[in-house]
Amino acid sequence: MRITLIGAGRVATHLALALKTQHQIVQVLSRNLDHAQYLAHQVNAQAIDQVTQLNPQTDMVIIAVSDQAIAEVSESIAPYLTENLVVHTSGSTNISVLGQSHQRAGVFYPLQTFSLEREIAWQETPLFIEATLYKDIDLLIELANSLSNRVYHYSSKQRQTLHLAAVFACNFSNYCYDMAKQVVDAEQVDFSLLYPLILETANKATQNEPKQMQTGPAM
């Protein structure tokens, strides 16, 4: 499959590196040409920093930018990509944000936390797809199956609910870890002493009902 990536951050980088083994990354577009060039070099793609340079001869365009920038990016590329399937990677953004500018709109959402220095176990990462046209579902399923064994067709409402839960399970939990580290750092206590507790808590939460595993107050 021929794919154009818009964005050169964490999600775009991980997607590009994972997809390049089975697909062709045609272009990487970023407002920062240096960032586009850095990622494009890794996946043998063309780096561009202007929407006027977009090549319409692609099967799919993946917008992997911040949630706040999706609508603006979608509108800016619309005059140059009139026939392409355009998807975003956001969990909290409705598909209608793209549908306002593109007849063929979709979502390709990986439920995962991304850091540039860490590899992703893509085969185990749930991928959630959605499309405005039925024919594009098959295209998204094909792409998702090339990465993961866990592919789901969710509506925007379902995906937004899942994203909210993910914020509690990931972002909020990590914030609590940071607070715990600040507490022990203040008294020169080794944070690694908490590692077994953190890991056991996570293991119990994934193997049992979390509510039943609460062993003490959270206040």
Indicate where each model-derived feature is located.
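Localized chelating/binding microdomains
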Residues: M1-I3, Q22, S96, L116-E119, ...
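NAD(P)+-binding Rossmann beta1-loop-alpha1 motif at the extreme N-terminus of oxidoreductases
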Residues: M1-Q50
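Hydrophobic anchor at the start of a short beta-strand
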Residues: I3, I25-V26, A45, N84, ...
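Hydrophobic Val/Ile/Leu positions in short beta-strands of Rossmann-like dinucleotide-binding domains
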Residues: I3-L5, I63, I129
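Rossmann-like NAD(P)(H) cofactor-binding subdomain of soluble oxidoreductases
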Residues: L33, Y38-E119
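C-terminal active-site/capping subdomain that shapes the small-molecule cofactor and substrate pocket
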Residues: Q212-M219
